[in-house]
């Protein structure tokens, strides 16, 4: 790849072993993440839980910080060895980070792995920035900045460095939520540049890791297009509602794979350039085979535009939460609290749990017009509804209920005819936000056999998580956001 080595002597190759150390540690990490939840399940009827992602990130940050400066003598003379090492360690972590982005693999909770992927990516970017900024400072101090900068192999590294900085900025939650597409495109471009350009930049070469990354990305790309095509059989919406009920035919070859809480990813047809450039969108199936003739999605208007007589690509189902007889066997009662389009996960889970234990379902939504969803599934008299907006709510709000659980509207009954609601199959409708101490009060008498399932916007889920933490009650959560 290079006509002659840039550096002579043992210092040129001293960092190679550290790259292999980091790679081997990442393999150990994969094995641990894959096996620990299964070991926890052996001999226990408790819910299988993934390892918390935050301690894993902290451990990696500490390990890399130690390895980055390990065994460097005469620091003032050989500090450049540390600078080079951070760059190599960053690249050798890339296969692990790519693997964490897989949606179909045996490492348990996909959404939990997504958090790990997000923060591992940031660690890789930080290590790369230490490498890049370190060399910028070195060249500037030596007075050789422009001499080194415009050498082709160095310039390729600078290009990757610039892309990584841009990615770090657009990955911040504020920017990512405002324009997920910009983040997604930037992310893919940066990964592609990282994998390819570093092949020509790194000294000594990282050919093995380039090959591994290339293989993993090729598999990921192949999986992305392992979809089936389907056309909506119906689109149901009502005036003033922010929700749309979209129905697809069940895919014959994978219909039995759907479980309560299963998700599918939907994208435009392969004939559209959008399917090649933009990310597919995750949706939760509100129905299950055997109980419904169609695969139904409850979609917030504006998140993904569906049109009848238009073909879409649908992925195989995947789950981030496990609801089966074994995982719920230790629970006697549960409260399901959902917000907005989070009703799509709550409906099949509620229908499954209601035959197993004492379960209450609460739905926080912006408008009474959204109740057509409950009416469609004959759940009007089985759900407590909290209206957090008003009937003239604009449906163009992109934030899926930011601050949903922080409204200060005084609680009041909206249904004057609530006393005969059972006869007319009307839900219990209240204005404002639910008081978790009130709606979950029954769980406090048996905290060890109770759980709260929350799904929807981040604010709602975090409120429920905090309440459960304070009352030592198990929390099962899913946040609805890209």
UniProtKB/Swiss-Prot annotation:
Membrane topology per record: Multi-pass membrane protein
Enzyme Commission code(s) on record: 1.16.1.-
Domain FAD-binding FR-type: 225-348
Membrane-spanning parts: 16-36, 50-70, 87-106, 123-143, 155-175, 182-202, 205-225
UniProt xrefs under Gene3D superfamilies: Nucleotide-binding domain of ferredoxin-NADP reductase (FNR) module
Domain Ferric oxidoreductase intervals: 86-198
One Gene Ontology cellular component: plasma membrane
First-listed, main subcellular location of the protein, grouped into a coarse class: membrane
EC class of the enzyme, as a word: oxidoreductase
SUPFAM superfamilies reported in the protein's UniProt record: Ferredoxin reductase-like, C-terminal NADP-linked domain (SSF52343)
Location of the protein in the cell: Membrane
Entry's Gene Ontology molecular function annotations: ferric-chelate reductase activity
Family per record: Belongs to the ferric reductase (FRE) family. AIM14 subfamily.
Stated name of the protein: Probable metalloreductase AIM14
Species of origin: Meyerozyma guilliermondii (strain ATCC 6260 / CBS 566 / DSM 6381 / JCM 1539 / NBRC 10279 / NRRL Y-324) (Yeast)
Gene: AIM14
């Amino acid at each position: 790849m290079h006509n002659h080595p840039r550096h002579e002597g043992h210092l040129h190759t001293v960092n190679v072993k550290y790259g292999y150390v980091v790679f081997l540690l990442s393999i150990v990490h994969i094995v641990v993440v894959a096996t620990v939840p299964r070991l926890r399940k052996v001999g226990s009827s408790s819910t299988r839980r993934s390892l918390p992602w935050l301690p894993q990130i902290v451990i990696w940050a500490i390990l890399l910080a130690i390895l980055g400066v390990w065994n460097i003598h005469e620091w003032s003379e050989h500090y450049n060895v540390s600078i080079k090492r951070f760059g190599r360690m960053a690249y050798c972590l890339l296969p692990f980070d790519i693997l964490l982005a897989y949606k179909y693999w045996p490492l348990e909770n996909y959404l939990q792995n997504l958090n790990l992927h997000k923060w591992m990516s940031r660690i890789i970017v930080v290590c790369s920035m230490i490498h890049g900024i370190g060399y910028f400072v070195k060249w500037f101090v030596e007075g050789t900045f422009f001499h080194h900068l415009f050498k082709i192999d160095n310039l390729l590294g600078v290009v990757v460095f610039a892309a990584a900085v841009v990615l770090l900025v657009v990955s911040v939650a504020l920017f990512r939520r405002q324009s997920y597409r910009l983040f997604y495109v930037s992310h893919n471009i940066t990964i592609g540049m990282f994998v390819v350009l570093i092949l020509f930049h790194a000294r000594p070469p990282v050919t093995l890791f380039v090959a591994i990354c290339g293989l993993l990305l090729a598999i990921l790309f192949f999986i992305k297009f392992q979809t089936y095509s389907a056309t909506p059989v119906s689109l149901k919406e009502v005036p003033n509602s922010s929700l749309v009920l979209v129905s697809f035919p069940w895919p014959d070859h994978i219909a039995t794979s759907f479980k309560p809480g299963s998700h599918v990813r939907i994208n435009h047809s392969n004939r559209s350039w959008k399917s090649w450039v933009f990310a597919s969108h995750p949706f939760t199936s509100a129905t299950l085979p055997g109980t419904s003739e169609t695969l139904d999605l409850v979609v917030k208007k504006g998140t993904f535009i569906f049109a009848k007589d238009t073909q879409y690509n649908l992925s195989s189902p995947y789950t981030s939460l496990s609801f089966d007889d074994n995982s719920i066997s230790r629970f006697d009662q549960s409260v399901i609290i959902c917000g907005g389009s989070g009703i799509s996960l709550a409906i099949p889970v509620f229908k499954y749990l209601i035959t197993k234990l004492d379960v209450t379902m609460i739905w926080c939504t912006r408008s009474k017009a959204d109740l057509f969803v409950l009416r469609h599934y004959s759940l009007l008299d089985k759900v407590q509804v909290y209206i957090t907006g008003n009937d003239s709510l604009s449906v163009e709000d992109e934030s899926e209920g930011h601050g949903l659980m922080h409204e200060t509207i005084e609680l009041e009954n909206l249904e004057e005819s609530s006393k005969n609601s059972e006869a007319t199959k009307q839900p219990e409708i209240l204005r404002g936000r639910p008081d978790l101490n009130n709606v979950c009060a029954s769980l406090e008498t048996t905290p060890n056999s109770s759980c709260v399932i929350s799904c929807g916007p981040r604010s709602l889920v975090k409120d429920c998580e905090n309440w459960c933490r304070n009352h030592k009650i198990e929390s099962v959560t899913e946040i609805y956001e890209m």
